[in-house]
């Protein structure tokens, strides 16, 4: 369940559209300046693992607030290199059902991270991310009517790389094929439940690959004061695949495993709007995903909205 908090988003979800066609603002057609930005995301997911020792199904309701500062590190005739620092805070709540009963997990996560992004003059980009997250979790059993753990500590981290190429089409239209690879790992402190069972961390890692294609439409105009405004709307289709074997925990010497359905598909729509010569901008995205192995059994939907101010 904590894995859902450590999964990294896309460049577009994080900061919206920083690279524009038309009259380029820089060698890379990318907004100059050092933006301060923030965004909030929320999602609801339901999971039926492909295999599970205990027949566990669970859902996850997540919200997360993220903020950051980006700075131009280098600019050449071929493109721009932008670095960033981020902080995040949020919660995730999960209701769990298995052959042994039902329960819930409530977790709070907070942490920080860093980003490094290359915007090429030819429309090519590469984005890298790293995040560290600390967790505080409460585990309860509805079947037993009591808490199993209170304030259990955990730690997770995520690493990711994304690359894409904007391909100009007729007029204001373009296509952006893109690929992303994200690794996440989560661990929690061992604890003993009220009945003396020792619960300890096994492995909880994921390596998710994403192939996506977005269709983009951009426009720009000048207001009465002569300042430029821009808009960008897009639709995106994604395929996801988890290359690893899921999670496992040890309960008093018994290994319990859960392996997710590995192949997923998703569709999304979103957009960005900037004004006052790109000093201010807002962006957002809505996204739905489902497992393609047992279509609809595992699914997720969510959205994010953000803003940035350039100084």
How would you describe each model-predicted region?
Residues 16-27:
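A short, compositionally biased domain-edge/stem linker segment
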Residues 5, 30-35, 39-311:
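Membrane translocator/pore-forming domains, dominated by Gram-negative outer-membrane beta-barrels
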Residues 1-14, 18, 34-36:
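Long, low-complexity repeat tracts used as extracellular stalks/passenger repeats
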């Amino acid at each position: 369940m904590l894995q859902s908090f450590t999964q990294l988003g896309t460049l577009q979800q994080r900061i919206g559209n920083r690279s524009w066609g038309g009259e380029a603002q820089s060698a890379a057609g990318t907004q100059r300046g050092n933006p301060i930005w923030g965004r909030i995301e929320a999602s609801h997911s339901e999971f039926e693992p492909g295999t599970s020792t205990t027949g566990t199904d669970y859902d996850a309701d997540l919200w997360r607030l993220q903020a950051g500062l980006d700075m131009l590190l280098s600019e050449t005739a071929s493109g721009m290199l932008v670095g960033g620092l981020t902080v995040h805070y949020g919660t995730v709540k999960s209701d769990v059902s298995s052959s042994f009963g039902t329960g819930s997990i409530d977790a709070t996560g907070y942490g920080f991270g860093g980003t490094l992004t290359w915007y090429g003059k030819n429309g090519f980009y590469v984005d890298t991310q790293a995040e560290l997250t600390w967790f505080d979790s409460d585990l309860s059993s509805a079947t037993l009517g009591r808490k199993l753990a209170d304030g259990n500590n955990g730690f997770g981290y995520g690493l990711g790389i994304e690359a894409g190429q904007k391909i100009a089409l007729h007029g204001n239209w373009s296509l952006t094929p893109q690929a992303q690879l994200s690794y996440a790992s989560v661990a929690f402190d061992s604890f003993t439940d009220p009945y003396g069972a020792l619960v300890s961390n096994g492995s909880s890692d994921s390596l998710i690959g994403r192939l996506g294609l977005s269709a983009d439409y951009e426009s720009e105009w000048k207001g009465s004061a002569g300042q430029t405004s821009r808009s960008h709307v897009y639709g995106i289709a994604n395929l996801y695949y988890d290359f690893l074997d899921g999670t496992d925990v040890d309960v008093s010497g018994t290994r319990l495993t859960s392996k997710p359905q590995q192949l997923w598909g998703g569709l999304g729509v979103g957009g960005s709007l900037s004004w006052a010569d790109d000093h201010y901008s807002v962006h957002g995205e809505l996204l739905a995903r489902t497992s393609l192995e047992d279509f609809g059994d595992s699914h997720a939907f969510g959205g994010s909205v953000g803003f940035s101010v350039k100084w």
